[in-house]
């Protein structure tokens, strides 16, 4: 070992703010010394010499920890030596500390480390698994470290180096008087005793998660340390002298320990009732004048921890007292007196927090009280609405209930700004949600006679309280005072939680007492004072926006198109529709010159557009109401497209507005197709404007608008297919013409490429919107003219299909676009749009098999195979699925040769993605029509031998795909008898090779890929049980040398007959042969 001076120098350098050498090297050097045989002696040297600094002495205590963990586990002599030293030095430094805390204040960190060491020793000594060996003189149990500590501190003037004195103190007994006398010596004596017991249970709480069993340790704690500590804590809580706040940390540690151990300890319940009662009494004594409510705040933190994590630690009687303090009401039969004084303390405390703007402390109080209320929401529910807890005196009971309701609502309606200043209303949302759920689940026979009236009264008041609480005026104030802080996010969460609460309350209040009330509140008076529909009174604007926000949540899950009720209530509120539009218009016209105005502008538009979209079903009943909404929405879009500001934030805001509006337009068009027919030409005219490349509109809006128009075009059925085709032709000419005009430019910059890609997506969106939204049988108008539509679109007299194909060909014939996967993807998407639609459905974009094949053959040779080929192959998969009845093996061969086989050796085999794609293509054929592949001339000459070689691949996706191929080949329910016979013969002929490749791949694979091989092997054993034995017997010796394991494996595997149990057998063989442990075992 280095000299003591060198070690001390290293320690001082380690703890210095600017060490000269590498800290890691210093740590490694010191750690090697700590773990060595000289470590114990080093610790004693560092702790015994008074000239060393606190850092050096702390390192000495830390060295005892290292010795304890490295050498004290199995060596009793080391354990005893470390135990002895810890007791000696704890007594030494504690004596110095209590004698002069100012001079020896730095010793406290050393004292706590020594206490932590003794805590670990306490655990080791009392663990029978650790001390079951050793000599007879070995200490088998250490009952009470607090008694030991007090005893040693009491005999400090004697020679405590004497081992006998130490041994006598280890399990000594102390009377209550001795304990009381010790803690009364000084505040520091008291503080050290509290700290020691706190350290012990904190460590025990940590150890509980690491050790399998600590039942005996818990028993020792329960019978000894618990009793002393409860006496110690209660002495502190009831002391008339100077109060020591350390007791609160000690109580918290013990609560956490008891909460953790009461479910695992067999020693019975460690009761905390006396402590809780003393805490309640002490809380009353904490006032503004006495300690500025400092103790009250700490006690409420303790209670909050109990209520949130383990409320049953507190007895029912104590919880009734707390209820009296928090709410000022108690059950008539509780026996609690002095109710008003108890609650007045809480009101004074709240007033103190509010008056002094202690909003953080007020938030903690709110959390504590609401956590208390949520301990047993069902009990509160029973109090209010059932006869289960009714008192004998009905009048007294009614008065109690009314008072209880009043307090709950007052707490919810706390008179400050939510989130920013008060948190009661925020946290109470969870309570009311739980209460409403509990109420809806009550058995009807238990309800009080007036429960329906009472619940309506409570929950309607609740809605009235929360509406102004979630107003955007609150959000405005938060942003003005704190900017875009976490408080804004908290407010948004609060607002959404209240809307969820309203949705939950609807099941109790229904339309009559909730939905209709909101609509009445919005529709009785005009919010805007002139024809511009701009709401100038901000209070009115905020109020109506809030009701719109909540109303949307309630309406969103209703089928309004089938609800006559909505028509009647809106008719009775003639300003409802106008006021919804006014919120939208006001939002759009709001200046966005400041951050807060930008945010609120978006909120107003978001709320109104969301509600307009939700009302789409209502407009099906009242189509004449659509006109002002459509005008407002397109006026909003027009405003967005004419946006000219260079301010980046304003541009971002404008883009968001545009997205909100076009989404709502799309929702209306999808739901109200027939009702919007009169606006169709207006929509197309607007599209003509925004489709131009110089239009200030996003690609998203262009594609959404085309889809929206397509919805309306789709329902143009009553006048025959010619009328529908007229609109489709007009739209395709517009889109195709714009694409071709752009392609004609000699330079294709990124801007032009993005524009063409957008227009292709517009064609795709148009094609999607023209697909029937329901089955044909549900569309009477189409059903009456079905044959007419089928004939028209089959012949396509306007040549719409060929025009669209021509446009796509022109794009992909371009040398830039043909190698860009984005254009290939959208091209294939459009061409395949009409594939796999229901039989007999007339559709304008159904290409036949030769047209699709010609498209693929035309563009594959020029594309970037690595990125583009998968889209063409996916299109072929759809083609095979669509024309599976007509396709022959010869046509499959043609596809396979021209699209895959020709590129296999040069490209596909070297690209895992393309390889997976190729195998997947064949798998798809086996799914759709297996005869196409099995009858192919390439089946036995290429597909089977190539896919056989791929089984032991190292690429995960290749393994998955090829295993799926062979599994599907072996076990396919879509074979006819001839195909089944052919496949069995083919598998039988290559069975040996197949099993070799499977077992070779299985043996060399990683564990995560075992399932693919397992599924394949299970299928083989299930379908070829007899042959499988022969194949395995022949193959396994070639894989690895484990004859006994192979025989066992074969026997077990065949017994499973391919069931799921085979998985465990295969796994065990793999583990045995790769010499890995089975961690599942």
Curated annotation (Swiss-Prot):
SUPFAM superfamilies: ARM repeat. Keywords: Nucleus, Transport. InterPro entries: ARM-like, ARM-type_fold, Importin_beta-like_NTR. The keyword Nucleus applies. It is found in: Nucleus envelope. GO terms for cellular component: cytoplasm; nuclear envelope; nucleus. Its main location: nucleus. It comes from the Eukaryota. GO terms for molecular function: nuclear export signal receptor activity; nuclear import signal receptor activity. The keyword Transport applies. Associates with the nuclear pore complex (NPC). Interacts with GSP2, NUP1, NUP2, TOA1, TOA2 and WTM1. Belongs to the importin beta family. Present with 9760 molecules/cell in log phase SD medium. PANTHER family: IMPORTIN-13, TRANSPORTIN 3 AND IMPORTIN 13. Nuclear transport factor (karyopherin) involved in protein transport between the cytoplasm and nucleoplasm. Required for the nuclear import of the complex composed the large subunit (TOA1) and the small subunit (TOA2) of the general transcription factor IIA (TFIIA). Required for the nuclear import of the RNR2-RNR4 heterodimer, also called beta-beta' subunit, which corresponds to the small subunit of the ribonucleotide reductase (RNR). May play a role in regulation of pleiotropic drug resistance. This is Importin beta-like protein KAP122. It comes from Saccharomyces cerevisiae (strain ATCC 204508 / S288c) (Baker's yeast). The gene is KAP122.
